[in-house]
């Protein structure tokens, strides 16, 4: 399974996402309010291999605190709701406030902060201008943009957006 792949490849970081085997894409972060012994075992196994562990999370401070208690090094904020409501200014403002508070809280308890899901060249810039993150995960949008603009140009565009924020 996934842990065997992690042990074999030993990536610098792995992000644990609460998807089931038949799920096509992520639609929520971890709910850590119940028994998490299996997840804790996976985190401990990755930590023993010196692999940074990130947990895919909704912007919920209580859940983020539990991620820290389980031994995660980082969280990856699930940005689907932000992207979905990007064109609605009221919803966007509320979402940006939630993500900002979640990011600041995570940083205050020494968790790194990543973000990802449905971020694209249109909504990424505003997100990064409002939220403190260490890295972003861009997948589908990058490949979709590359189909029309080419991979080289698309990667450069995303890097420019990120470097404006990260440099």
Where are these regions (language model features)?
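Glycine/small-residue-rich loop that forms an oxyanion/phosphate-binding "nest" at active or ligand-binding sites
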Residues: 1-35
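Glycine-rich phosphate-binding active-site loops on the catalytic face of alpha/beta enzymes
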Residues: 16-23, 74-86, 132-151
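Structural preference for beta-strand elements that scaffold enzyme active sites
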Residues: 13-15, 50-56, 73-76, 110-114, ...
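Catalytic cores of alpha/beta
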Residues: 1-8, 60-70, 115, 119-133
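Alpha-helix-loop-beta-strand connector modules within alpha/beta enzyme cores
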Residues: 32-54, 91-115, 158-166
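C-terminal helical cap(s) of enzyme catalytic domains, especially alpha/beta-barrels
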Residues: 28, 87-92, 144-167
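Histidine/lysine/aspartate-rich catalytic loop segments that bind and position anionic ligands
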Residues: 21, 52-105
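Aromatic/hydrophobic pocket-lining residues that form the small-molecule binding cavity
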Residues: 35, 39, 60, 95, ...
């Amino acid at each position: 399974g996934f842990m065997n792949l992690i042990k074999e490849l030993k990536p610098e970081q792995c992000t644990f996402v609460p998807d089931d085997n038949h799920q096509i894409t992520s639609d929520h972060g971890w709910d850590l309010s119940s028994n998490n012994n299996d997840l804790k075992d996976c985190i401990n196994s990755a930590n023993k291999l010196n692999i940074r562990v990130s947990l895919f999370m909704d912007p919920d401070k209580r859940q983020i605190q539990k991620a820290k208690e389980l031994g995660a090094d980082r969280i990856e904020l699930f940005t689907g709701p932000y992207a979905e409501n990007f064109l609605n200014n009221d919803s966007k403002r509320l979402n940006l406030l939630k993500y900002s508070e979640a990011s600041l809280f995570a940083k205050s308890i020494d968790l790194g902060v990543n973000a990802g899901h449905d971020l694209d060249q249109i909504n990424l810039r505003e997100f990064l201008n409002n939220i403190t993150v260490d890295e972003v995960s861009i997948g589908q949008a990058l490949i979709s943009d590359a189909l029309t603009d080419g991979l080289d140009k698309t990667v450069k565009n995303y890097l420019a957006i990120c470097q404006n924020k990260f440099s």
